[in-house]
Amino acid sequence: MLTNPSQALIRNSKYFQQHSVLVLNYEADTFAHQCLEFADNVTALALDYNHHLTLSSCANEKLQSYFGHQLPESLADTKFDSVIIYFPKAKPLMGYLLQLAAQHLNVDGQLIIVGENKGGIKSIAKLTPDYYSQPIKQDNARHCLVYVSYLIQAAPTLSIRDWVSQYSLETPQGTLQICNAVGVFSEKRLDQGTDLLLSHLPDNLRGRVLDFGCGAGVITAALLKANPELTIECIDINAMALLSCELTLAANSMQAKVYPSDGFNQITGKFDGIISNPPFHDGLTSTTDIATQFVQQSAIRLTSNGIWQIVANRHLPYSETIATHFGKVNVVAENNKYKLYLHQR
């Protein structure tokens, strides 16, 4: 099943007939594979690890699938006839994607942008740098818009540092330097949930620790500030978050293993601690299901004397799930928005 933006692209396949195509920020479908019906070859870069997993099983000699904030070094200088960008949910990320696309186009190369009507794509003309021609709307279908532009002059060389902000953050463990890549949400201050978590960290945390949904690495950096002996693994599905986490660790002269994982699927072994401000707060049924799976998998992945501590929106129904899988619910702190759950075996 193709998403609406992908269906809109298929309607406009005439723009990439027999082209070598780069697809940036693709969605959780197999459009890039179906694109081979029209294109000569396709290279796809996902910024969401789940989207990458959806497509990677279809990879072949004419379809290359990658995950990350940019293509591998071996493809850094590769040019394509056309670059397709799916308009991102985080609007500021579009500027980065436009410059990234330009690195892989020759002058006069074609840029195709697709996005949902209500997703911000109508502002594309204001967002497009002057090294592209003015984007022209080519189609309005499936509640989506399709624009085409061309590279009219060479773009500045992309430096990821130009798309990363760094700031000092005060935490209960001390001052940290936090790096935020574009597209990663940050208030540039400690949010209520993370503040509650860091204010009540267990002092007996030891060994191998998992930071689930690490974001920019605030929790990991605070943990290592308090206890440099910890062996921490940081996982997320967002490429820009993983990049942010790596840069945050470097800025604080800290080390941890940072890698993508779809839930616990890419993780091996058990942990002495799982500490998290998990990324499910909206209360939707699908989100609640993911949260339930998180608790269930946490119980499996925790060592016999492990520590599990998470902070979550107080309205989310964690208590019943925690009782089912851990046997006891301990709320060690709370405020008007969040609850802090702790389980020590």
UniProtKB/Swiss-Prot annotation:
Record's catalysed reaction(s): guanosine(1207) in 16S rRNA + S-adenosyl-L-methionine = N(2)-methylguanosine(1207) in 16S rRNA + S-adenosyl-L-homocysteine + H(+)
Main location: cytoplasm
Molecular function GO labels: 16S rRNA (guanine(1207)-N(2))-methyltransferase activity; nucleic acid binding
UniProt cross-references to InterPro entries, sorted A to Z: DNA_methylase_N6_adenine_CS, Mtase_sm_N, rRNA_ssu_MeTfrase_C, RsmC/RlmG, SAM-dependent_MTases_sf, Small_mtfrase_dom
Keyword Lipoprotein tagged: no
GO cellular component: cytoplasm
Signal peptide stretch: none
Keywords: Cytoplasm, Methyltransferase, rRNA processing, S-adenosyl-L-methionine, Transferase
Protein's cellular compartments: Cytoplasm
EC number(s) from the headed UniProt entry: 2.1.1.172
Domain of life: Bacteria
Enzyme class: transferase
Self-association state and partner proteins as the record states: Monomer.
Protein name: Ribosomal RNA small subunit methyltransferase C
Organism: Shewanella frigidimarina (strain NCIMB 400)
